[in-house]
Amino acid sequence: MGMDYTPRQIVEQLDQFIVGQKQAKKSVAVALRNRYRRMKLDEGFRDEIVPKNILMIGPTGVGKTEIARRLAKLVGAPFIKVEATKFTEVGYVGRDVESMVRDLVEMAVRMVKEEKMAGVMNEAEEEANKRLVKLLVPESKKKPAMKNPFEMLFQSDGSDGDDETTEQDSHDEIRSKRKRIAHQLALGELEDHIVSVEIDEVPPSMFDMLQGSGMEQMGMNMQDAFGQFMPKKKKKRNLPVSEARKVLTQQEAQKLVDMDEVAQEATSRAEGSGIIFIDEIDKVAGKQENAANVSREGVQRDILPIVEGSTVVTKHGTVKTDHMLFVAAGAFHMSKPSDLIPELQGRFPIRVELEKLTVEDFKRILTEPSNALIKQYQLMLQTEGINVEFTDEAIERLAEIAYQVNQNTDNIGARRLHTILEKLLEDLSYEAPEITMEKVEITVGYVDDKLSSIVQDKDLSQFIL
C-alpha cells in the first residue's frame, strides 16, 4: 500500500496522467495523507477523526473521475464509481444507495483475493504440475470387483499372487512413466499436448431478474444458501498443456486461500481505506418545484446516512462507512452546490472547482501524460510497421481545434480530443495494412485538410466532432 506518500509525491504521481487541476490534486492528496496520519494515532482517538469528504465542481472531461481513479490505484485502495442518478429513494423500483457500499466490499474482496492468490502462486503451480502428470499418465484401471459369489469358489488358487505381481509391475511402470513426463513438462516439451481437465460449471443465476430492482442482496443471499445444498457441476474441457496449467494453477491457488480471512481483511480495508466516487451529484440537486425534484431530494436523504457513517449489511458481514472517503462530483450547469440539502452540503466540507481546459492544456494532454493520446495512436500504428510523427505545429493546431469546437458546441473537455484524433487518422488507420511507407509525418497542412471544413461548418461539427 502506498499510504506513506507525501502530498507532494501524490501530486507528482497524478501529474503523470492528468494535466493541470493543481488545486483538485492538492485537495485529494491532503485527504489521502490525513488517512495515513489517522492510522498513526492512538486507537482511542483514531475513531474521532473522520475523513473530510470532497465535492468536485467542474464541466465534463476536465479530470474529475480520473483524479479519484488514479488516486485509488496509487495507494491500492478499494475504489468504485457510482452515478447518483442510478439510485432511487427507498420504496421505489431501482437500486438503493446501500448497494454502493456492497459494491465497494465486493471490489475489496476481489483485490485481497488476487493478492493472496499471487502469494501462493508458486506452490499452486507445483501442485498443478503434479496434477498434469497424473492426467497425462492416469492410473491403470483396477480389476472389477467380483459380483458373483461363485467366482471365488471356481477361481484358480494361484491367481491372487499373479494379480498382485501384475499390479506391482503396473505401479512401477506408471511411476517410471510419470517421472519421464514430469521431466518433459519441466523442459516445456509437452506444451501443445492436449489434456482433458475438469472445471466447475457456472450455472446461470436464477436471480439475475433482481438486478437493478434494489433486491440484489436478497438474491445473492438466497443463491449462497441454495449453493450450499446443491453440488457443483463439473464439465470436462480439452486444453493444451499450457492452458490447462493456468486453469489448474488457479484451482490450486483457490484451495490454498482462506476465504474467511480474505473477507475479514477486505471488509477492514473497505472500512479504513475505501473510496466511493459519486458522479452526477448535481443531477439530484434542485429546488422543490415538482414531484421529480421531491424524489431527487429523497435520494439525497438516503445518501446522507451512508456519508455520515452507518452500518451496512453485506454478504461478507456488516461494514461501517464512518471512515470511507466520499468524493462527489458534478458539472452544476443547471444547479448550484447550495441546491443540495444543507445536511449533505455539510458532509462535503472540501470544495474544489476544476478549471476549464485551455489551448495550452489540450497541447499538454496530447503529449505529456505517460498514456498520452498521441503515444497511444503511434504505438497502435507501429504494429502495422508505420511510424507516425506529429509536428509541433500540427499538435498546436489540434489543440486549437479541440478548444474551438468545445466553445462552439457542447464543452466535453478532453474527450473532444478522442473524437478529433479518430477523425484525423481514420483514413490512415484504414489503409495502414497496405501502406509501404515506414514513416508518416502529420503536418499542420494534413490537419487542416482533414478537419478544417468540418470545424468551420458548425452544424457538421456537432455531428462529426
UniProtKB/Swiss-Prot annotation:
GO terms for cellular component: HslUV protease complex. A double ring-shaped homohexamer of HslV is capped on each side by a ring-shaped HslU homohexamer. The assembly of the HslU/HslV complex is dependent on binding of ATP. Pfam families: AAA, AAA_2, ClpB_D2-small. It comes from the Bacteria. Gene3D superfamilies: 1.10.8.60, P-loop containing nucleotide triphosphate hydrolases. Residues 153-175 are annotated as: Disordered. It is found in: Cytoplasm. SUPFAM superfamilies: P-loop containing nucleoside triphosphate hydrolases (SSF52540). Belongs to the ClpX chaperone family. HslU subfamily. Its main location: cytoplasm. GO terms for biological process: protein unfolding; proteolysis involved in protein catabolic process. ATP binds at V19, G61, V62, G63, K64, T65, E66, D279, E343, R415. PANTHER family: ATP-DEPENDENT CLP PROTEASE ATP-BINDING SUBUNIT CLPX-LIKE, MITOCHONDRIAL-RELATED (PTHR48102), ATP-DEPENDENT PROTEASE ATPASE SUBUNIT HSLU (PTHR48102:SF3). ATPase subunit of a proteasome-like degradation complex; this subunit has chaperone activity. The binding of ATP and its subsequent hydrolysis by HslU are essential for unfolding of protein substrates subsequently hydrolyzed by HslV. HslU recognizes the N-terminal part of its protein substrates and unfolds these before they are guided to HslV for hydrolysis. HAMAP family: HslU. The keyword Chaperone applies. Keywords: ATP-binding, Chaperone, Cytoplasm, Nucleotide-binding. SMART domains: AAA, ClpB_D2-small. This is ATP-dependent protease ATPase subunit HslU. The keyword RNA-binding does not apply. One of its GO terms (molecular function) is ATP hydrolysis activity.
